[in-house]
């Protein structure tokens, strides 16, 4: 609890100088949540940078990595809005990247029997090869970054993140 009090004090000391003065109470739970939010922002930036570095030799980017991964894990393809929902991005942003990926031969658009105007995104043979190449670098990276973290801690973290996503995704 002393570490929490020290962190809360540090955040209080920094916030006013950053123009973030607030009259709302600084409960420990609120401060922990805000610490979590800032940490997730930082983690996102680090994951994008790591993803770009990992995929560079494959001629890809972390944005393409995300799309390839989501489509590869779907059983029957996904629509652009479906990919956007999974990634928490706008449909327009996903449409831009999938259009470029289609031009580059990584994905193809196929008719959707469930919706005439919303086509399915599927991996081409080249896209499947890229996915397998990504797995060759992604799997050791994942192992390296989690080898000293107990599986229970990862499971608890995943449950918390999914719960917050569900709560915020309204």
Which residue stretches match the model-derived regions?
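Residues within the DNA-recognition helix of helix-turn-helix
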Residues: 93, 97-100, 160
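Short Lys/Arg-rich basic patches
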Residues: 32, 95, 111
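N-terminal helix-turn-helix DNA-binding core of bacterial DNA-binding proteins
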Residues: 45-90
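Base-recognition residues in the alpha-helical recognition helix of bacterial helix-turn-helix
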Residues: 38, 66-69, 95-97
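Charged, amphipathic alpha-helical coiled-coil/dimerization segments
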Residues: 9, 23, 79, 99-156
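Hydrophobic alpha-helical core bundles mediating ligand binding, dimerization, or RNAP-core interactions
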Residues: 33-55, 131-149, 154-168
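N-terminal leader segment of winged-helix/HTH proteins
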Residues: 1-58
